[in-house]
Structures are given as structure tokens and as C-alpha cells.
Amino acid sequence: MDLSLTYRALQSGELDIIAGNSTDGLISALDLFQLEDDRRYFPPYQAVFIARSDKMSVLSGAFGRLSNAISTEEMRRLNYEVDGNKRTPREVAGEWVKSR
């Protein structure tokens, strides 16, 4: 099932619990909450940069500035701007970069 559909099914009461992504904007958009995985069942999710090796010299500086720059909560808020407020990813990311 599409992850966005599972969030909507959870919100509507069709499901009681789902496995999702901690940075999904739909958590905020649909006023849901994240349970703590105190038994560490799910492995940690780490976002990584992926690029072609011939572009690394151009991108390494930008990647360095972005590394560890966004918390889970902030990423969720940014995703909410796209998922909940229907803004474009380019607009949201552009504002975030300018705010740094």
C-alpha cells in the first residue's frame, strides 16, 4: 500500500498502527504522533548524499555544509510544507537554504 494511503487510513480509523518514516510531513499534516521505538526494533534511518563520482568535486562543498544540518523535526516540518501546505519542494528548500 502507498505510504500516504496508510497514513490516511490511520487517521480515518481504518488502521490502528502503521510503520512509517519519522520525517514524513503527513505525520504533522494529519495530526498523528510517532511512537517511541524503545526496543530498537527498526534500524536507524540515515539519509545520505548520492551523486556520480565525476560531480563530487563540484558538490563536496555543498554536501559538507548540509551534513547534519537538518534535524528529524525540522525535516518533518519541511516535508509538511510540501505534503500539508502543498508548496513545491523547490520553494521550501530554497527558503530553508536562505534562512541558513
Language model regions located:
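Ligand-binding "clamshell"
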Residues: L10-I17, L26-R39, P44
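Short secondary-structure boundary segments
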Residues: N21-T23, S53
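Short, low-complexity, polar/charged sequence segments that are solvent-exposed and flexible
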Residues: E36-R40, S53-K55, S67-I70
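Short helix-initiation/N-cap motifs at beta->coil->alpha
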Residues: M1-R8
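A bilobed periplasmic-binding-protein/Venus flytrap-type ligand-binding module shared by bacterial periplasmic
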Residues: P44-S57
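Ligand-binding clefts/hinges and TM-proximal coupling segments of bilobed small-molecule sensing domains
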Residues: V58-R100
